[in-house]
Amino acid sequence: MAVTFSDLHTEEGVKSVEEHLAGKTYISGDQLSVDDVKVYAAVPVKPSDAFPNASKWYESVASQLAKSFPGKAVGVQFGGSAAAAPAVEAEAPAAAADDDDDMDLFGDETEEEKKAAEEREAAKKDTKKPKESGKSSVLMDVKPWDDETDMKKLEEAVRGVEMPGLFWGASKLVPVGYGIKKLTIMFTIVDDLVSPDNLIEDFLTSEPNNEYIQSCDIVAFNKI
């Protein structure tokens, strides 16, 4: 039976993962599965020690994924989620104190001093601003040439495309008509690393995969 999680960027969402993992190693049992990758992609940062099950699971999934991508990583941070709000709020008093340092109590601030203060403020904002690298969930239709196309081999060709930042998810065969079926498949991407258009043009509909795949259409595209 499918498990439903929501708002995994919030403490409440992570709590639901924590409770689900009680007595389990991974989302769907004792082995890593596509379910773990999908949930991992939706959790922006490692859960705190307040959620020991979720924290241990997150580290385990990260370790398994690292083995699949042996290239040297420089580290990526994800910004813009509600989970990051406390850290930003914690910095606010310090910023206010810095603002006080720039005040001229006697009203004698010159244009040069004012410009210098503005430059310092801009530099502080640039330092605090995290570099964002968002994730997206994509639903795609993959169409065969005809009813004689081996759909098992077609799906193997699709899932055989591997690259950093690309995570294949659940799939199903959907009847189109005249005995033809299409493959509907979900996948998650790191936006800075993978372009759906390039994935389709350079890998899925080019040789050798075009032996089975006629065309691909993006059905849904949602930011995580």
UniProtKB/Swiss-Prot annotation:
SUPFAM superfamilies: eEF-1beta-like, GST C-terminal domain-like. Residues 14-65 form the GST C-terminal domain. PROSITE patterns: EF1BD_1, EF1BD_2. GO terms for molecular function: translation elongation factor activity. Residues 112-134 have a biased composition (Basic and acidic residues). Belongs to the EF-1-beta/EF-1-delta family. EF-1 is composed of 4 subunits: alpha, beta (1B-alpha=beta'), delta (1B-beta), and gamma (1B-gamma). This is Elongation factor 1-beta 2. It comes from Arabidopsis thaliana (Mouse-ear cress). The lineage of its organism: Eukaryota, Viridiplantae, Streptophyta, Embryophyta, Tracheophyta.
